[in-house]
Amino acid sequence: MRPFIIGIGGSHSKVGKTTVACNILKKFNGWGAIKYTKTSFYSSIIDSPEILQQENKDTSRLINAGAEEVLWVQSPFENLQEVLQIAIDRLSHLKGIVIEGNGAIEVINPDIVFFVSANEDLKRGSEKVLRIADAVMFDRYLPKETPRTATKLHINNEEDYINFIMRRLRIV
């Protein structure tokens, strides 16, 4: 059975995607995480503790937040679906997986899509993920293109997005 998958995308880098992922992982035991980084030429799935636990890396933050397993997927977008499916299969024994990265959200069908935005600006291409977001997490301003159907959550209100997930998991 496929684990419950939460995709976390965002308006641009350094917007808080990893912080949101870490907050989720702190609350849900038995979950793993996949960090996606777009590359130009090669694909890989990194599971080496020496690499994943390097200080100040997003992957080390995910591990420290309590992820049972973390994989770092690196791939050109055109190969991502195949590589990401392999990574998901490797974590299929877990209760859930948090997947970080806009491209990853575009090629899989997460059970929940969170879009993290610090302001109204969007990097090119991120509007695709915004359009399918179940919830938009914002700091000061919602992106202009925020769908009416998306739940609006303040990025600093961790309790609201944990409750959003719990409702989807039918825990509450």
Positions of PLM-derived features:
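Short, well-ordered secondary-structure micro-motifs
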Residues: 44-49, 82-83, 109, 126
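Short, high-confidence coil segments that cap the C-terminus of an alpha-helix
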Residues: 31, 67, 92-97, 110
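Phosphate-binding/switch loop-helix module in NTP-utilizing enzymes
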Residues: 73-105
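N-terminal phosphate/diphosphate-binding loop that engages ATP/GTP or pyrophosphate donors
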Residues: 22-75
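Conserved catalytic-core segment of NTP-binding enzymes
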Residues: 89, 93, 102-172
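Short beta-strand segments
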Residues: 9, 35, 99-100, 116
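Short coil/loop residues immediately preceding or within conserved phosphate-binding loops
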Residues: 3
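Glycine-rich phosphate-binding P-loop
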Residues: 6-24
